[in-house]
């Protein structure tokens, strides 16, 4: 089978343009919380259809906001439901790239399995191949998949990294660039040890990748500044991006600015303070200020 290639124009932007990634990919499980933060309480809507319609309105408001452009934002991570919908009458991925010069990325995982060896692997993704084909047709550049590390257990961390890189091969073959996201719990009591084990396991896999195969890494901001510099410099790594992981926007930005070459891929820290009740002017101003702060922290 011929391996498909990623979109070269988007690859070039992801590789060399300053900026960060907006994570707009809360899925079924985290949507009620995201809506509540936005000022829409669960008792004001009923059923998944209404919930997803409301969250799409919220995301549309973000994506169409004047400050939300490719000047400071490299890419946006979308939930599958968002990819299947439209923004301003255009399919979401097209809208982002054609109108905003923002690279579209799709969250592909189906959530986390039960904890084993101090980690949570991803649940199986049975229809991954057909989802990747659909994403490629819709103009998606890359994917994102998250697993979760709670303790510094070598067996658990190795299992997480093995699974991530195995699925990454399937994604690369479909002509997409995978974001590998082995999140380390910010409340982990042995966080620094877990991060050292994670780095070791990732470098082992990265060193086995053939020339020209790209991956991105999405990681918790580490206890030791610049811990992941070897990963940033690795020939197969397009970008190393950081999740906010429950840190406030101020703390996430502060930690990010100390990690040179790492850029943000924030979700909660990006939308902090935005509400449905704000006027468009208030909403756009607050979003623009958040984008600027995260952008500045990303270019250090």
UniProtKB/Swiss-Prot annotation:
Pathway: Carbohydrate degradation; glycolysis; D-glyceraldehyde 3-phosphate and glycerone phosphate from D-glucose: step 4/4
Enzyme class: lyase
Record's keyword annotation contains Lyase: yes
Molecular function terms, GO-annotated: fructose-bisphosphate aldolase activity
Catalysed reaction equations from the record: beta-D-fructose 1,6-bisphosphate = D-glyceraldehyde 3-phosphate + dihydroxyacetone phosphate
Superkingdom in the source lineage: Bacteria
InterPro entries: Aldolase_TIM, FBA_I, FBA_I_Gram+-type
Similarity comment: Belongs to the class I fructose-bisphosphate aldolase family.
Name of the protein this chain belongs to: Fructose-bisphosphate aldolase class 1
């Amino acid at each position: 089978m011929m391996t498909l290639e990623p979109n070269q124009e988007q690859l070039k932007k992801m590789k060399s343009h300053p900026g960060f990634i907006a994570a707009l990919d809360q899925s079924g499980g985290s949507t009620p919380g995201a809506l509540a933060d936005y000022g829409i309480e669960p008792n004001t809507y009923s059923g998944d259809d209404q919930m997803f319609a409301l969250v799409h309105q919220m995301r549309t408001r973000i994506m169409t906001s004047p400050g939300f452009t490719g000047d400071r934002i490299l890419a946006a991570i979308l939930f599958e439901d968002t990819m299947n919908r439209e923004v301003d009458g255009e399919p979401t991925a097209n809208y982002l790239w054609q109108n905003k010069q923002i690279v579209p990325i799709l969250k592909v995982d189906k959530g986390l399995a039960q904890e084993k060896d101090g980690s949570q692997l991803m649940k199986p993704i049975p229809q991954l191949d057909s989802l990747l084909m659909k994403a490629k047709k819709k103009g998606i550049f890359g994917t994102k998949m998250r697993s979760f590390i709670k303790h510094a257990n070598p067996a658990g961390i190795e299992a997480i990294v093995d699974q991530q890189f195995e699925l990454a091969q399937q994604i690369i073959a479909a002509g997409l660039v995978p974001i590998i996201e082995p999140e380390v719990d910010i409340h982990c009591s042995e966080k620094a040890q877990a991060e050292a084990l994670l780095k070791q396991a990732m470098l082992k896999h990265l060193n086995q990748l053939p020339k020209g195969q790209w991956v991105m890494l999405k990681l918790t901001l580490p206890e030791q500044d610049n811990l992941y510099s070897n990963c940033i410099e690795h020939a197969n790594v397009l970008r190393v991006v950081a999740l906010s992981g429950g840190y406030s926007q101020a703390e996430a930005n502060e930690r990010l600015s100390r990690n040179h070459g790492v850029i943000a891929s924030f979700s909660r820290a990006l939308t902090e303070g935005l509400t449905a009740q704000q006027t468009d002017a208030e909403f756009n101003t607050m979003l623009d200020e958040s984008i600027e702060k995260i952008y500045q922290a990303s270019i250090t």
